């Protein structure tokens, strides 16, 4: 198992892309808390069943920015918290997130996660599902140990909402009758709910009051929506090294994301027939991904998706208007910009 300090870099490195500077600044501001969170993650991955820490360490070693736990840590400190409860809750948030990744990769039959072989590709589907269950259980142990019914309500509700979002995505898969509102319901559930809860519990442990908790919940929700919109755009616009997974996975899986919806509705009858064949009937040839990329580019669906994301990022920033100016507040504002800069 890796030492805790290896889990995340909290300082900018020469290899960091410019758009990552915002997250590096946020990480630096909560560096001591983040190190304590990393230690808690390692400690709580421990199990006498050797496969559990081995598989969990594999996905942890694959990297990731620890954005969600950083949001919990930063939200608590923004609200003036001086205790340590937020550290365990940040680890809880990361366990929920990691469990969903393990389950998602099995459902999606993904071979890559963050540029490395996915856990299911290395350890198998059964092990990935069961270790994901273990991490969910660990997360709930941490909630109970915290002792706050408010925290338990927020994070358990988020876990249920994530599952609902994933099921809704399954229902809408291969369905071009899905509208933009339904698509947004999917990403609110599967992605944004945990962003929102991560921020909200930071305010709750600080005892800042309902207004602050609601503002941070809104910040996290809109940040998460923007993040997922950009993620869905990148699946049709990024290279594999940047994306960390195979480009075009959403297309091959028949996922109905906003770039596809926009291109489909703007397309000619011939173009719509292409989308019906490849997405609805899942009849895809070796040249179809390239044609899909060309249609999405023709109708500027990536640009339109990023424009939608920018609107949610601005809304996230507006949610922080009631907090006094500080380096932490600025870092959270910059984190919203980071979500957009990933697409540039």
List PLM regions with ranges.
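All-alpha prenyltransferase/terpene-synthase fold signal
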Residues: 1-344
């Amino acid at each position: 198992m890796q030492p805790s300090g290896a889990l995340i870099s909290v300082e900018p490195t020469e290899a960091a892309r410019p758009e990552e500077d915002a997250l590096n600044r946020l990480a630096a501001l909560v560096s001591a808390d983040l190190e304590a969170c990393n230690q808690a993650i390692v400690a709580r991955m421990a199990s006498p069943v050797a496969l559990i820490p081995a598989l969990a360490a594999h996905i942890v070693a694959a990297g990731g920015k620890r954005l969600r736990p950083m949001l919990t840590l930063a939200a608590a400190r923004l609200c003036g918290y001086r205790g340590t409860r937020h550290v365990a809750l940040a680890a809880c948030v990361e366990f929920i997130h990691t469990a969903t990744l393990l389950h998602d990769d099995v459902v999606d039959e993904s071979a890559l996660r963050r540029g490395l072989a996915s856990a299911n590709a290395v350890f198998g589907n059964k092990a990935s599902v069961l270790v994901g269950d273990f991490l969910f259980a660990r997360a709930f142990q941490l909630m109970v140990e915290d002792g706050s019914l408010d925290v338990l309500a927020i994070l358990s509700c988020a876990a249920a909402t994530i599952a609902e979002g994933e099921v809704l995505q399954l229902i809408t898969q291969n369905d071009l009758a899905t509208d933009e509102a339904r698509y947004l319901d999917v990403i609110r559930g599967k992605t944004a709910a945990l962003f929102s809860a991560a921020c909200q519990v930071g305010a709750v442990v600080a005892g800042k009051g309902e207004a602050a908790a609601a503002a941070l919940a809104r910040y996290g929700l809109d940040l998460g929506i923007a993040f997922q919109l950009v993620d869905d755009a990148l699946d049709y616009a990024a290279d594999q090294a940047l994306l960390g997974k195979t480009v075009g996975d959403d297309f091959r899986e028949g996922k109905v994301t906003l770039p596809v919806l926009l291109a489909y509705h703007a397309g000619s009858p011939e173009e719509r027939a292409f989308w019906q064949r490849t997405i609805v009937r899942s009849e895809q040839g070796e040249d179809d991904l390239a044609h899909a990329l060309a249609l999405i580019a023709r109708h500027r669906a990536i640009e339109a998706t990023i424009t939608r994301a920018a609107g949610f990022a601005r809304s996230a920033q507006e949610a922080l208007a009631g907090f006094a100016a500080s380096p932490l507040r600025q870092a959270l504002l910059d984190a919203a910009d980071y979500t957009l800069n990933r697409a540039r």
